[in-house]
Amino acid sequence: MAKKSMIAREVKRQALVERYAEQRAELKAQGDYIGLSKLPRNSSAVRLHNRCSITGRPHGYIGKFGISRIKFRDLAHKGQIPGVKKASW
């Protein structure tokens, strides 16, 4: 489990990215790179890192489900992810 501060930091970054998305797009379209540099650093989508929504784990992230491979396996075995079943051939 990731530290609570790391999870909170990532949530804060996500909020900043959403807040400044339109403004960043306009400045980028105009080519105003000085204006872009004056925006907060964490408002750039490049600074986001994919994290598991349950544990905050940064590695082994499955984007389609928004969780790590470990939690995915656990929830899939319990049948808590709709449409997912163990492969057999």
From Swiss-Prot:
GO MF annotation terms: rRNA binding; structural constituent of ribosome
Any Gene Ontology CC annotation: cytoplasm
Gene3D superfamilies assigned to the protein according to its UniProt record, in alphabetical order: 30s Ribosomal Protein S14, Chain N
InterPro entries listed in its UniProt record: Ribosomal_uS14 (IPR001209), Ribosomal_uS14_bac/plastid (IPR023036), Ribosomal_uS14_CS (IPR018271), Ribosomal_uS14_sf (IPR043140)
GO biological process: translation
Keywords: Ribonucleoprotein, Ribosomal protein, RNA-binding, rRNA-binding
PROSITE patterns listed in its UniProt record: RIBOSOMAL_S14
Cited Pfam families: Ribosomal_S14
Subunit structure: Part of the 30S ribosomal subunit. Contacts proteins S3 and S10.
Matches recorded under PANTHER family: 30S RIBOSOMAL PROTEIN S14, SMALL RIBOSOMAL SUBUNIT PROTEIN US14M
Functional summary from the UniProt entry: Binds 16S rRNA, required for the assembly of 30S particles and may also be responsible for determining the conformation of the 16S rRNA at the A site.
HAMAP family reported for this sequence: Ribosomal_uS14_1
Protein family: Belongs to the universal ribosomal protein uS14 family.
Listed name of the protein: Small ribosomal subunit protein uS14
Organism the protein comes from: Exiguobacterium sibiricum (strain DSM 17290 / CCUG 55495 / CIP 109462 / JCM 13490 / 255-15)
